[in-house]
């Protein structure tokens, strides 16, 4: 059984990680442990680069906390201009996989709160009246009437971030002979 350390204690993120690992490696193949670690970036990252850096740094910090694990996984949500998205980073001892989630445009009223220094989850809780929305369906759930959730959107991106760990094409070197592929 794989020991997977999730660099989060957020239930929506842990659910997505658990589902993605079960889908790729089989049900019951992984034990997910959530740990609270710092991203090293702002609480609300406001660029693609800052968000990706935050995910990478969470994985690095999770590795320090649980060096004995088989996998370390981080999800960092961010905003660039008026677009929300998240970066997924998955590592084991040899490989790293990364993927960016689907993105969506935030309305001006939400961006006003972001520009005033609030995190997206806090601003959405304020506007919707849903307590702790970021641990539930998130802004995604609110805007899609529950058709999508943070977990469902993150799940898809995590499946993509896991590609290097189960697809042998990722293990091939660029200069390998590929004539047998024709």
Swiss-Prot record:
Cited Gene3D superfamilies: 3.90.950.10
Record keywords, A-Z: Hydrolase, Magnesium, Manganese, Metal-binding, Nucleotide metabolism, Nucleotide-binding
EC number: 3.6.1.73
Cofactor note: Binds 1 divalent metal cation per subunit; can use either Mg(2+) or Mn(2+).
GO molecular function, one term: ITPase activity
Top-level EC class: hydrolase
Binding site for substrate: 68-69
Catalytic activity: XTP + H2O = XDP + phosphate + H(+); ITP + H2O = IDP + phosphate + H(+)
Single GO biological process annotation from the record: thiamine metabolic process
Domain of life (superkingdom): Bacteria
Keyword Thylakoid among UniProt keywords: no
Cofactor: Mg(2+); Mn(2+)
Pfam families: NTPase_I-T (PF01931)
InterPro entries to which the protein is assigned, alphabetical: ITPase-like_fam, Non_canon_purine_NTPase, NTPase/PRRC1, YjjX_NTPase
Transmembrane segments: none
Binding site for Mg(2+): 38, 68
Assembly description: Homodimer.
Function in brief: Phosphatase that hydrolyzes non-canonical purine nucleotides such as XTP and ITP to their respective diphosphate derivatives. Probably excludes non-canonical purines from DNA/RNA precursor pool, thus preventing their incorporation into DNA/RNA and avoiding chromosomal lesions.
The family this protein is said to belong to: Belongs to the YjjX NTPase family.
The protein's name: Inosine/xanthosine triphosphatase
Organism name: Erwinia tasmaniensis (strain DSM 17950 / CFBP 7177 / CIP 109463 / NCPPB 4357 / Et1/99)
């Amino acid at each position: 059984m794989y020991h997977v350390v999730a660099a989060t204690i957020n239930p929506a993120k842990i659910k997505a990680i658990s589902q993605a690992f079960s889908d790729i490696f089989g049900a019951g193949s992984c034990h997910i442990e959530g740990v609270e670690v710092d991203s090293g970036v702002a609480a609300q990252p406001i660029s693609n680069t800052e968000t990706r850096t935050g995910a990478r740094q969470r994985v690095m910090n999770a590795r320090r906390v649980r060096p004995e694990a088989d996998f370390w996984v981080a999800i960092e949500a961010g905003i660039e201009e008026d677009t929300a998205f998240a970066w997924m980073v998955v590592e084991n001892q040899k490989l790293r996989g990364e993927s960016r989630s689907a993105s969506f445009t935030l309305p001006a009223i939400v961006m006003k709160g972001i520009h005033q220094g609030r995190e997206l989850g806090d601003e959405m809780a304020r506007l919707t009246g849903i307590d702790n929305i970021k641990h539930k369906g998130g802004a995604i759930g609110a805007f899609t009437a529950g058709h999508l959730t943070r977990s469902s959107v993150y799940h898809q991106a995590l499946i993509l971030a896991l590609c290097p760990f189960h697809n042998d094409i990722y293990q091939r070197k660029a200069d390998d002979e590929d004539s047998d592929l024709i």
